[in-house]
């Protein structure tokens, strides 16, 4: 489904260990690495979509994670022009996402990238909290920076400030308005919330 502005509702997942390292996976038959993410079905809430995508892309069940929180509202990014299919009845120009922070409480043996017949990833590893902002494909760097910036205070309550650290300068530049990686659209301004996160009750729009 695509909203009237051309954005597809989507969820993103930051899966974090107790030490602040996050799950980082390589897409099948591609060199690109990213966080798990996926589109929402019309009958799903963001939370329901998140658990479905978690199962499909990592093999994990709800009992293998603890849901810590989510970004406030939708964060948007635009697709590069080469990826926009103009001949479709509904043209998708980008994604609007809710990002979830999950603490991994299971065992690594629970991670199964081949859980479905069409796996999204073929390899994974743990990386530092801010690493993905500088290594994801360029057009996603702005939304990654915004998502991790919102979730970092909550991550620090689990892993500690030293383990999570602060956003590196290059990652900060990806988030700042005017950056080529930040995208043309930015989330609408909302009242600041303590800790940068909202409760998990998020309504679809």
UniProtKB/Swiss-Prot annotation:
<feature type="domain" description="Nudix hydrolase">
    <location>
        <begin position="6"/>
        <end position="149"/>
    </location>
</feature>
<comment type="similarity">
    <text>Belongs to the Nudix hydrolase family. RppH subfamily.</text>
</comment>
<dbReference type="InterPro" id="IPR000086">
    <property type="entry name" value="NUDIX_hydrolase_dom"/>
</dbReference>
<dbReference type="InterPro" id="IPR022927">
    <property type="entry name" value="RppH"/>
</dbReference>
<dbReference type="InterPro" id="IPR015797">
    <property type="entry name" value="NUDIX_hydrolase-like_dom_sf"/>
</dbReference>
<feature type="compositionally biased region" description="Basic residues">
    <location>
        <begin position="186"/>
        <end position="195"/>
    </location>
</feature>
<dbReference type="GO" id="GO:0016462">
    <property type="term" value="F:pyrophosphatase activity"/>
</dbReference>
<protein>
    <recommendedName>
        <fullName>RNA pyrophosphohydrolase</fullName>
        <ecNumber>3.6.1.-</ecNumber>
    </recommendedName>
</protein>
<keyword id="KW-0378">Hydrolase</keyword>
<comment type="function">
    <text>Accelerates the degradation of transcripts by removing pyrophosphate from the 5'-end of triphosphorylated RNA, leading to a more labile monophosphorylated state that can stimulate subsequent ribonuclease cleavage.</text>
</comment>
<feature type="region of interest" description="Disordered">
    <location>
        <begin position="178"/>
        <end position="205"/>
    </location>
</feature>
<feature type="short sequence motif" description="Nudix box">
    <location>
        <begin position="38"/>
        <end position="59"/>
    </location>
</feature>
<dbReference type="InterPro" id="IPR020084">
    <property type="entry name" value="NUDIX_hydrolase_CS"/>
</dbReference>
<dbReference type="Pfam" id="PF00293">
    <property type="entry name" value="NUDIX"/>
</dbReference>
């Amino acid at each position: 489904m695509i909203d009237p502005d051309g954005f597809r509702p989507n969820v993103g997942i930051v899966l974090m260990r107790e030490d602040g390292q996050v799950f980082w996976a390589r897409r099948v038959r591609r060199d690109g690495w990213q966080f798990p993410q996926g589109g929402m079905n019309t009958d799903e809430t963001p939370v329901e979509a998140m658990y479905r995508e978690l199962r499909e892309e990592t093999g994990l069940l709800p009992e293998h994670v603890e849901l810590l929180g989510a970004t406030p509202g939708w964060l948007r990014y635009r697709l590069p022009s080469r990826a926009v299919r103009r001949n479709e009845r509904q043209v998708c120009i980008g994604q609007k996402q809710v990002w979830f922070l999950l603490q991994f409480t299971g065992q690594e043996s629970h991670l199964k990238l081949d859980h479905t017949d069409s796996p999204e990833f073929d390899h994974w590893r743990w990386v530092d909290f801010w690493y993905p902002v500088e290594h994801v494909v360029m057009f996603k760097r702005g939304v990654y920076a915004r998502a991790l910036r919102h979730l970092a205070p909550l991550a620090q309550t689990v892993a500690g400030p030293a383990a999570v650290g602060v956003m590196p300068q290059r990652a900060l530049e990806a988030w700042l308005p005017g950056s080529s990686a930040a995208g043309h659209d930015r989330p609408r301004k909302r009242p600041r919330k303590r800790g940068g996160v909202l409760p998990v009750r998020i309504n679809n729009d």
